[in-house]
Amino acid sequence: MYYDDGIPVFDSLDKLTKPNSMKVVSSDSSEKGDIVLEPLESGFALTLGNALRRVMLSSLIGSAVYGIKIDGITHEFTSIQGVREDVTDIVLNMGMLRCKLNGTSNKCLSLSAKGPCQVLAGMIETDDQCSIVNKDLLICTLGQDVELNMTIYVASGKGYLPVTKYKENEFLKPMNEQDLISFIPVNALYSPINRVSYRVENSRVGQVTDKDKLILSVETDGTISPSQAVDSAARILQEQLQPFISSDISYKKSQVSSPSGYKDLGYDPILLRKVDEMELSVRSHNCLKNENITYIGDLVQKTESEMLRTANFGRKSLNEIKAVLNNFGLSLGMDIPDWPPKDIDELARQHTDED
């Protein structure tokens, strides 16, 4: 791979310190944890830490209650006979409900209770498409023989949608005016992140002690783990940066010294090798086979997100493949013009014969 001025990309990349796989240091709570990445070039920890923190706080997808309906109630500025909390307090409590949607972006839940009792979030009826995380959350307190029937509207989103903008919610569009009369909007905090901070410490590589160590302290709402939060933020950054890579850098045949017979192949001979030669684990090899990825040239054009969508293909397999490709001076997400070449099998045989 070359820059437009002919400078090999990998010549410059190889001079940078590459971090090891991230280390997760969990606390007693599954919602809190430290994510450690080292070693990094001096200054890189600050750059990466700030970017990851901002993305985690602003752009991760989560689920939240955006509205409720209570039988017999048309607005929140009222009270319910026999219920200790007024409707405004109930609305505020529902805004603190943390749930996780699976396989759907919008869900309608039901809650029915009869007093005397404390109505908790764990009493909400759910199915395999929705799970409640904070089941001990107090919603309200019912008196003797008081009944409460509530409909709860949950959706996936990002950021924060206040009640002043609730009509911008796309899931309200199917509702008619009659339905909206008794609909009580709730401030929807979709972000699954409670807080994120980072610090930079020194890291050592051999005798060099001026490298960086990045430590991200992440606290979530329990719907995702700290490591999942960092993983999602990194994927978002990767997708946003991908156009810069594909538009400014193009792949050209490597000019490293190699046998003269390779010059007639038209492609870097490494790309014509079959993935069988990469000596991957059985799981990784089978995943590539199932996706009809035969040559290394086929593989390097896949992005990380595409690979992770492959059945039975996880991050361990991804890291294995990235490490092997890195040894060849290659990476995932490369743009190779005119691939695959005509008569690729014949070209591959030529390469094998030259070997």
UniProtKB/Swiss-Prot annotation:
One BP term from GO: DNA-templated transcription
GO molecular function: DNA binding; DNA-directed RNA polymerase activity; protein dimerization activity
EC id: 2.7.7.6
Region of interest (Alpha C-terminal domain (alpha-CTD)), residue spans: 267-355
Gene3D superfamilies hit by this protein: 5' to 3' exonuclease, C-terminal subdomain, DNA-directed RNA polymerase, insert domain, RNA polymerase, RBP11-like subunit
Stored SUPFAM superfamilies: C-terminal domain of RNA polymerase alpha subunit, Insert subdomain of RNA polymerase alpha subunit, RBP11-like subunits of RNA polymerase
UniProt KW Transcription keyword: yes
CDD domains: RNAP_alpha_NTD
UniProt cross-references to InterPro entries, sorted A to Z: DNA-dir_RNA_pol_insert, DNA-dir_RNA_pol_RpoA/D/Rpb3, DNA-dir_RpoA, RBP11-like, RNAP_asu_C, RNApol_insert_sf
Positions of region (Alpha N-terminal domain (alpha-NTD)): 1-248
Catalysed reaction, written as an equation: RNA(n) + a ribonucleoside 5'-triphosphate = RNA(n+1) + diphosphate
Subunit text: Homodimer. The RNAP catalytic core consists of 2 alpha, 1 beta, 1 beta' and 1 omega subunit. When a sigma factor is associated with the core the holoenzyme is formed, which can initiate transcription.
Protein name as catalogued: DNA-directed RNA polymerase subunit alpha
Species, as recorded: Wolbachia sp. subsp. Brugia malayi (strain TRS)
Lineage of producing organism: Bacteria, Pseudomonadati, Pseudomonadota, Alphaproteobacteria, Rickettsiales
